[in-house]
Amino acid sequence: MSPKQVFKSAGAVAMVAAIAIAGTLLSVRRLQADEEGREQSRIRRGFEIAPVPLNLAGKNRALVGLGSYIVNAQADCDGCHSAGPQSEFAPGGNPYFGQPTKVNPDTYLGGGRDFGPFPGPGPFPHIISRNLTPDKTGLPEGGHTYEEFKQILRTGIDMDHIHPTCSGPPDGTCLPAPFDGNLLQIMPWPIHQNMTDHDIRAIYEYLSAIPCIEGPPAPSILHNDCN
């Protein structure tokens, strides 16, 4: 092969490589654009479906919108973290009655749903969903920091230690073995623990933007100091 032929061959190889690289970069950019488009779509939809006024002061707007989408369109957090089916929806807004859906803002994520004695009938504690709204500090879920909130979703730890493991016969306040009283029961944290940090942060940001619900008087675990 002559030097001229070698040069032409090398040039052809370089051109093919350049085309391949350009194609790869274009594919990556398209994927990034598609993902950004999906993210923006979720953010917009999140604001559209938020059932309560949002306080965006000092908040990351994009995270609040994404958090609303996750909480209201994917996770159905209010389905458990409201006082129950009877008060989850506003009058005339129960979709199960064939009515246009309207969430009750007075109970939205304020907790209070009683799942009954756990693990079943007997002298066992009632599992009641927690109040997820922010308190007077502006921090959601009883004033927990983001790191604490993330730890709850990742590990299921019950930072309030409401129902410890029984050290003797069940008395209605403790959980019988083999249930671990350090962990939240019923809450599907084993599923939530697989969420990305970005999504968990978005949920936290959204919960910090919703109105505070005071709930029943202290010392109820559902009580929030709103002012």
Question: What do these predicted ranges mean?
Answer:
Residues 2-14:
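N-terminal Sec-pathway targeting helices
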Residues 11-24:
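Hydrophobic membrane-insertion alpha-helices, especially the h-region
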Residues 28-41:
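Ser/Thr/Pro/Gly-rich low-complexity linker/stalk segments immediately outside membranes or between
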Residues 42-72:
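Electrostatic cytochrome c docking/interface patches
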Residues 45, 87-122, 161-178, 222-226:
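Surface-exposed intrinsically disordered loops and tails
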Residues 60-100:
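Sequence/structural segment immediately N-terminal to covalent heme-attachment motifs in c-type
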Residues 69-76, 82, 154-158, 205-212:
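Sec-exported extracytoplasmic/periplasmic mature domains
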Residues 75, 96-152, 160-161, 189-200:
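Electron-transfer interface patches adjacent to heme c in soluble/periplasmic c-type cytochromes
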